[in-house]
Amino acid sequence: MSTPCPLPPPPVGAVKAIRSLRLWEYETFRTHDVLHVVCMATEDDLKANAEYIRLADEFIVVESGSNRNNYANVDLIVKVARRCEADAVWPGWGHASENPKLPTALAYHDIAFLGPSASSMDAVGDKICANILAQSCDVDVIPWSGSGLTVEGITIPEDTLRMATLRSVEEAEISAQKVGFPLMIKASEGGGGKGIRMVNTMDELRVGYPQVQAEVPGSPIFIQQLSTNARHLEVQVVADQHGNVVSLYGRDCSVQRRHQKIIEEGPVTVAPRETCVKLEQGAVRLAKKVGYSGVGTVEYLYNITTGEYSFLEVNPRLQVEHPVTETITGVNLPAVQLQIAMGIPLHKMPHIRKFYGQLDANGVSPIDFDTAPQNPPLGHCMAGRITAENPDEGFKPTSGAIHELHFRSLPGVTGNFSVGVSGGVHQFADSQFGHVFAHKSTREEAGVLLSQALGELGVRGEIHCNIKYLRALIEKEVFRNDAHSTAWLDGLIAAKDKPVDLSLTAHAIVMCGAVMRAHTRHFELEERVVDALTRGVPPEAWMTNLSEHKFELIYDDVKYALRVTQGSPTLFYVRVNNVAACEAEVLTLANGGLKVFLGGRARVVHAEPSKVGLKVHIDGRPCFFPDDRDPTRMTAPGTGKLLRYLVADNARAQEGTPYCEIEVMKTVMPLIATSTGIITHLLQPGASLETGDEVCAVQVEDPSSVRVSEPFVGEFTSFQARKLTGSLKLDSALVTHNLNSAGIIQILAGYDSPGTTTRFRRF
């Protein structure tokens, strides 16, 4: 019995790996009793109801917190593997997947590693080494801190490495003068958007360098010139332990934010086929040169204007987007990883044989992979990563509970999710918790299908989500025309270009928020009244006014003075600045949400817990009504960890500039001062943060300059409740009588009806 031990790389990876290995197990042995899957899990993962825990045969609980305590801890991984008597360990991506110490330690205990050997990982997994080796193979490399350095073999001397590596901000400044701006600061051991910063000036370099250090502690750092107007193309390579290497076409992963992919697709359509062949051949040559074994990815930058390309890096592991390649080739990559670790040559793997057009998929005849033709791509696959990020705030990571997740499968659509209903995304997790793939004959058709699939996907909870933003990106003309670059999405974010639902205006959002708050308050007051009466205490007078609620809501820095009156359990009247604005009919849903009929449209509204305001989801779109801001307090916008202060204690902070840095889901982010004045540190670096926690107190320099929410003035859009449809063949007098009778009953029940004077007419 073989026992792989998948480690949650992020958890969505473990879910995918388990399913792929189970599929191979049944295809090969027609049973589910061959593989016994054991997973590591933290208490945070258990509380988050991580899906991979349910799929595994067993799990072993390890320490929570930073990945240094668990999934990046080589000693712990080996200890767990030995404890469960594992035959193999699947490392996924991230964490310890690119640490050569892991395969070395596992080999010492005769445990297979489903990845490359330590020597080949050393050779190409380190980004600095990979660039030097690429230069040595006459592969074009864009200018960087190690330009011109070459070696004869695959072993890179320490002094050569030192010449390419930067050990301080001062060394980075000297190298930047040679490389030129704009440039990238990179951690050699980084990946997945971690340990990388784009800078345009020396001042930005001085800020970005320590941020890269903090995201990937202990990693060597280098700089690289930024390639403009480029596409991010990558080649999937597979190599066995017998010297055979093949490429499985390429992928285009050019839609990125913070240098982390968000939409992937394949095969490559932006470059001519002859260019793609050169990329694939170069990837195979590099893998052969270093004696690579396992599954890996060779990445390139392709200039869409000139048609030139240059080497970027090698990822010596499976990547998040590998199902794109699986879809267009029919090759199960986690299963291939397992077979490579078992010593099986590529020509004896059924999926590889099918890909090379061999009629006998279970045969063992040799294949000349250098000359044998491959099957053409099986259509086009496009994928979108589902992340717990807030697109309205530059894709800031968020964490919290997930109350609802529904994914409707369509023909040609698949989805992998690391959590389900009653799950969540904790602060130490990766922000990605889902991946949706659409497969059709052409790129255009795949894009349409992915957009439709995202429209059918619903996620509701304490987290923010990128689903609607993803769908808007796919529908943009630049993307549909295949004319975007790696800088496209970051440019949209910088320009605050957000998808706009023209039917969901600010006034409609305020009305939905007002109805939800009034509905919630009604039941809160009702509970207090019942509790008081149960205890034999007369309720206070303010508790008994269940049908009228006065409050303010702030949206987009505008403050709305609202008065909401209930005419019945299902009818709400809203006044803005004491002027009638809305009549809304409400249906309470089984999951606690409301269906609000407003201005001829039905909106599904859910409220989510928040310490700093009212958060609602309107048709899946998160909308936030913050509490009034206190200019003397600077607070945490979400969960995370305080890393360091950028402004000293009892020093002056300038509004609009960073005053500290926090770590949110493995990403370093600045907090921006909301007032100008002398700040007092209230927390020590390393402190855990929750939403609303006060980080600094501020002695405001000029109270008159404090930005406050402006009261709403002007004319508010008028909304009416839904109108009856269909045929009512009743006497008009009888209808009027029934309506009046219903209104009287509601008034006697304690409800109010602002429309009494117009509703009740003589007949």
Regions found by a protein language model. Give the residues of each.
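Short amphipathic alpha-helical segments
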Residues: K194, E264-P267, D430-V436, T632
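Catalytic cores of soluble metabolic enzymes centered on carboxylation/carboxyl-transfer
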Residues: P323-R575, A687-F763
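Conserved nucleotide-binding/hydrolysis modules and their immediate coupling elements
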Residues: S568-L571, V576-G593, G599-A602
